[in-house]
A protein has these predicted regions:
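Acidic/negatively charged segments and metal-coordination signatures
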Residues: 1-41
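Metal-dependent nucleic-acid phosphoesterase active-site entry motif
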Residues: 57, 76, 81-123, 276-317, ...
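Extended charged low-complexity segments that act as oligomerization/scaffolding linkers
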Residues: 38-46, 52, 65, 94-96, ...
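Cysteine-rich micro-motifs
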Residues: 21-28, 71-85
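Non-catalytic, alpha-helical, charged scaffold/linker segments
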Residues: 177-334
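Acidic, PIN/NYN-like endoribonuclease modules and their adjacent C-terminal/linker elements
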Residues: 46-48, 53-59, 79-82, 109, ...
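Short, flexible, mixed-charge glycine/proline-rich loop motifs
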Residues: 2-9, 43-52, 67-74, 90
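Long, positively charged binding patches that form subdomain-scale interaction surfaces
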Residues: 304-393
Length: 488
């Protein structure tokens, strides 16, 4: 049904069928829609040119602005008067990579969002506003980058207040299009590299922990003036899957914690080695279980069809688990060495059960952390680790080696500061901060600021202009979201 909107009076019934008067229902929405349509219709090239403006070398008008760029090693100026254009090259960059734990993102969000129920409480801690100011400014000056991760996504989805969309806006704003690969992918990448060294007869060779190999995006490129994001809702069953996995991990940790409490005579390194070597056995058992389940599926589905039942298809049964992906990547390495069939399987089993498996950074760090938890349990700790402990261990073990600094919660930072963890973790040259060392973190950020040369800052000023922190980040997001509702 097509309605002539011009014939609807303010006091007429609304065209949407709600039964309310037009002025009380869709009038504002329709006016905003018309305004946005006109704005879109009138978009021109000038809309993609912004300040800082300076005098054009051709027409002498102060209309020589910066053309919109997303990222890369060049930027372009164009004159909105005579359309003269010039291209400029950015110098190479080496930014500091800083990983911020989810609770940092959450507190920054509460500080910036006046509508948050925790806004006033967050402002009682001046640190959150101060740290955001420094991080946002350094990010805009292309001195640091704070990649987001799947841990941020999952934790944000589970959070009710602040909302997922609001948290996502904060961590994507600070990440500038850089996202760490997920925990399982990083595990597989490290194992592939370590296995190659093992097969080459050099299992103790240090891995190349280049952050660019485990980050989507380009952490050491100049960031763009425009950030492109995708607004995605959780897929069906995603929240349930995250809850189920967290609960399973927590129950497993509680069970092993109770065992640790009884192991009062064990040495710290016994627990560390136990955790490390459990990775290989766990990978093998998980892969075998997947193969058995896959082999049973045709019979299961056929039986359901023949008995007139609708097949219960579980996607988790169809897609290979992380353990099977690891075995598949190991098989490829075996083929490079002309090993196939039984000989390849024996070699893979030999490797996964070898003493060298503990040298893989992600296994090394996680084993140390679980060893530290076991030691606390054996020495009398009564309370269980919290629900997020496994997530914290996974995040730290996978992302710490690729970060120049990480800001994590106090309990995890305290574990990493214990002996011998502190000495072992030192090999990764990563600075570790928490709320207990928040002043040191602010000082660290100030030190990064002092490394910026006058030439670097001049380029930033010429290509980006204002680098002041975006205090209206969430207000602008809400307005943009409101506009999106009325866009056709």
């Amino acid at each position: 049904m097509i309605i002539n909107m011009s014939k609807i009076g303010r006091n007429d019934k609304c065209h949407c069928g709600s039964g309310f008067k037009y002025k009380k229902c869709c009038l504002i929405k329709d006016d905003r829609r018309d305004m946005l349509k006109k704005r879109i219709k009138n978009i021109s090239r000038k809309d993609f040119i912004s300040g800082p403006y300076k005098k054009c070398p051709k027409c002498d008008e102060n209309t020589f602005g910066v053309f919109l760029h997303t990222s890369g090693n060049r930027y372009r100026r164009e004159c909105t008067n005579c359309w003269h254009a010039q291209s400029y090259k950015f110098p190479p960059l080496k930014k500091k990579i800083i990983y911020l734990d989810q609770f940092v993102i959450s507190n920054i969000n509460k500080t910036l969002d006046p509508d948050s129920s925790s806004h006033k409480k967050a402002l009682e801690e001046p640190f959150w506003l101060e740290v955001y100011k420094k991080i946002d400014t350094l990010s805009k000056q292309n001195l640091i980058v704070c990649p987001d991760s799947s841990f941020h996504t999952d934790e944000s989805l589970l959070c009710g207040d602040p909302s997922y969309e609001s948290l996502k806006e904060v961590y994507e704003h600070l990440s500038h299009g850089c996202t760490f690969y997920d925990h399982n992918t990083i595990t597989r990448f490290q194992l592939q590299q370590h296995l190659a060294n093992y097969m080459a007869g050099d299992p103790t060779k240090h891995l190349d922990l280049n952050a660019e190999h485990v980050i989507h995006g380009h952490p050491h490129e100049w960031t763009g003036k425009m950030r492109i994001g995708v607004s995605m809702r959780p897929y069906e069953g995603q929240l349930e899957s995250i809850h189920k996995e967290r609960k399973s991990h927590y129950e497993g940790l509680k069970s092993v914690f109770e065992r640790w409490q009884k192991e009062k005579e064990r040495d710290f390194m016994d627990w560390v080695k136990e955790e490390a070597y459990a990775f290989g056995e766990g990978t093998i058992k998980s892969h075998i279980a997947h193969l058995k389940k896959r082999a049973e599926l045709p019979h299961k589905y056929a039986e359901q069809y023949l008995t007139g039942k609708e097949p219960e298809i579980n996607l988790e049964d169809l897609f290979p688990p992380p353990s099977s992906q690891i075995i598949e990547s190991m098989t490829i390495e075996m083929h490079r060495h002309n090993l196939r069939g039984e000989s390849a399987l024996k070699k893979m089993a030999e490797y996964l059960r070898s003493k060298y498996i503990i040298d893989i950074p992600i296994i090394h760090i996680s084993s140390l952390l679980y060893g530290a938890l076991a030691r606390k349990a054996a020495h009398g700790q009564k309370s269980y680790p919290n629900m997020g402990t496994v997530t914290d261990v996974n995040a730290i073990s996978s992302l710490l080696p690729y970060s120049d600094a990480i800001f994590i919660d106090n309990p995890m930072a305290a574990l990493l500061n214990e002996r011998p963890l502190k000495k072992e973790i030192a090999r990764y040259n990563t600075k570790i901060f928490s709320l207990n060392t928040k002043e040191e973190f602010l000082k660290y950020l100030d030190e990064i600021q002092t490394t910026a040369t006058p030439e670097h800052l001049a380029i930033v000023e010429d290509s980006y202009g204002d680098t002041k922190p975006s205090f209206n980040l969430l207000k602008n997001k809400k307005q943009s979201k409101e506009d999106d509702r009325y866009t056709i």
